[in-house]
């Protein structure tokens, strides 16, 4: 199954492209040079992991949180004017530990964090936490952050994933950073310099919480069980 996915990724890559298999976090940020930088970084880094002390030594903001180390790496490898689109757990926006506060400060002061897409639960299967997508451009400081609270009007899950239609309004409004019942802007001057808190606080009525129905949860569990059974059957056939 993993080999099949790898083949599909390789077949979809441009002939001029290349793949590098390495542990990104073992690279010291101080060693990254201009020739190592990129114009665009799109990523969904793993979060919830705990990195070893020797790995943390490679970063100016030391933390065991895997996703926070990756975010520092992404900012570093972008060229001036480079664009980033990163999926990260939503608690990054409000955590009060020193690493989270320092990382938000770094992001706001070294990049233009222009968009925060607040995703509903179930958007990314297996994440276990709510997520946001942060869109930024490296170089100029952040002057204004535009938030959009995604609400597809239904519960998301493995059998009912997010689709292009769900994102249509976001794509339309984001072009001009327009305000709406689901979107608003926050002036960087109003962000608390002590915490750099970026919590999603919709001034038009607060955060909508979509509760999944019991049947939806049962259906997803059944689908996951069926998938697990298929994987186990495949493994048995290899033994």
Predicted regions and their residues:
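A conserved structural/catalytic subdomain of Rossmann-like adenosyl-cofactor enzymes
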Residues: 21, 26-239
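S-adenosyl-L-methionine
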Residues: 1-35
